[in-house]
Amino acid sequence: MILVIDVGNTNCTVGVYEKQKLLKHWRMTTDRHRTSDELGMTVLNFFSYANLTPSDIQGIIISSVVPPIMHAMETMCVRYFNIRPLIVGPGIKTGLNVKVDNPREIGSDRIVNAVAASEEYGTPIIVVDFGTATTFCYIDELGAYQGGAIAPGIMISTEALYNRAAKLPRVDIAESNQIIGKSTVSSMQAGIFYGFVGQCEGIIAEMKKQSNSNPVVVATGGLARMITEKSSAVDILDPFLTLKGLELLYRRNKPTTEK
């Protein structure tokens, strides 16, 4: 079995794979102040609930967009699993031809998603990740990562609206069936929801136009289902795309990461 860990700005997603099959997965809040012991106890609690033990794990791979938490994460892996994890970053074999100005600037989550999407669904393809930021990545018909777009995520935008507009309340993010709200709350929810549906469709349409291609569009991320259910621009919803990519990258780099 291998342990895959995706460290995002808001949440960390943890998964256990055996023979390319996702057996278990969990989510915990990303807290850059957590110690390695706190992280270890949290993961061991997940394992206990699933009747797993640290000795079941032969390898670990981590993707992170939160550098301050990485020392604690790596220490946790060594202390509680006796494994030095593979870190997604410079030097890892991805199989991607990255054609951007500075490849080191690209978030590891975007690379992981691109690897998984290309392998699972073919190319050309657009990957939309609804996370803390909403990211759009384009991989061309030759499998080259050509770049993409980054926009504020739904939660960031919602919090900004509440924090910067004195008379507007904090609202839950929810699907809205009516674009014409009858109250302040319903109007905000309609604006947020349909605004992001429109953003998603607009950026995808412009990417297709500028790339002169007709790529498959796959969406992932915590809020992907809510948005994509209202949008015809997305072809595939894959909530485990990032975990799939981590498992695939582990296999591609396995000889240097085995226990």
Swiss-Prot record:
Keyword Kinase applies: yes
Listed GO biological process terms: coenzyme A biosynthetic process
Main location group: cytoplasm
GO molecular function terms attached to this record: ATP binding; metal ion binding; pantothenate kinase activity
Pfam family, one: Pan_kinase
UniProt-annotated binding residues for K(+): D129
UniProt remark on cofactor binding: A monovalent cation. Ammonium or potassium.
Classification via SUPFAM superfamilies: Actin-like ATPase domain (SSF53067)
HAMAP family per UniProt: Pantothen_kinase_3
Biological role: Catalyzes the phosphorylation of pantothenate (Pan), the first step in CoA biosynthesis.
Listed name of the protein: Type III pantothenate kinase
UniProt source species: Listeria welshimeri serovar 6b (strain ATCC 35897 / DSM 20650 / CCUG 15529 / CIP 8149 / NCTC 11857 / SLCC 5334 / V8)
Gene it is expressed from: coaX
